[in-house]
UniProtKB/Swiss-Prot annotation:
Keywords for this protein: Repressor, Stress response, Transcription, Transcription regulation
Protein name per Swiss-Prot or TrEMBL: Heat-inducible transcription repressor HrcA
Source species taxonomy: Bacteria, Bacillati, Mycoplasmatota, Mycoplasmoidales, Metamycoplasmataceae
Organism superkingdom: Bacteria
Family named by the database record: Belongs to the HrcA family.
Record Gene3D superfamilies: Winged helix-like DNA-binding domain superfamily/Winged helix DNA-binding domain (1.10.10.10)
Record function comment: Negative regulator of class I heat shock genes (grpE-dnaK-dnaJ and groELS operons). Prevents heat-shock induction of these operons.
Biological process according to GO: negative regulation of DNA-templated transcription
Molecular-function annotations in GO: DNA binding
Amino acid sequence: MPKLDSKKEKYLKQIVENFIKTGESIGSLNLKQSYGIKKSPSYLRAIMNQLEKEGFLEKSHSSSGRIPTLQGFQYYAEFLSFDENENLANKLKDLFARRRINIENTISEAVKLISESVGTTLIATTNNENERLMSINLTQISQNEGIIVVVSSSGNVENKKITFSEQIPRQDVKIAIRLFQERLINTPLLEISSKLAILKQELEKQIKHSDELLHHFMEKIFNFQVQNKSNIYNKNSLILDKEISRAKLVDLLYIIEKKSIWEMLEDRTTKDDDTLKISIKSPEVSFISKKFEKFLPIKEISMVGAAKKINYSAARTGIKLLEDFLSNKSKIRKG
């Protein structure tokens, strides 16, 4: 896509933002009046003619004004949508300042705010790579059975039944649980199996059937695997949008529920950020996808909506503030 000079960028930005706000075309006189531009309408008309010839604007069928083309929206989204959206920024900063809210609830509320402000359906993908063991306890429920309660740093609670036997006696399980409480708390869930091998010698000093017990814990209790989870917010934004055909809607609902939008967009990274992809290929749909650093709890955020209705500056504002918040939280935890 050719890079425009600063003069053309200024007026294209105003025309696109006016259309996002009003949904209407704009002529040179209205552009001058709306933005207090000191140039004459004829000067602005000449600039708009140039932008039309270059494929960034087109004439509206219902008036003499012009509206952005898909290329105009793509250019705006990639190069001109960096102004902070003050309304969303203030809401997010207020949310992030509430120390009483746990991190998971904060993230959930933040992405809801972003989705509503941008005017899109938003998909937030997380996984358990960074989850840690926060507690492990045994509750006996009968003479021969117990429940091992495992709590992770995300607040996830798993209840796993254990049957006591000659090879796995109740007293040995209690000893093992006590050792795990001393040595495994705050260990990443996906590293627990490897740490159990280190604890084997310590267990052998205290219990008779350490091999059988360790094998049971590795197979039945600490059998954690990488799991991706996608939460969808503001789905009605897609479902109720009259500009999206029913056939396209079916395709989009399948995509947001079954696929990684980041991977689907292939090489659509923006010039300024190789972790951000923006794709505007039809009036019906625009995709925005952000890949987060591995150590952060969110792996990917993607937004889907009608190309000409999305508030692109709000999208950038929300993504940046959320990324900054999560990065700061991660540094505090590591420190």
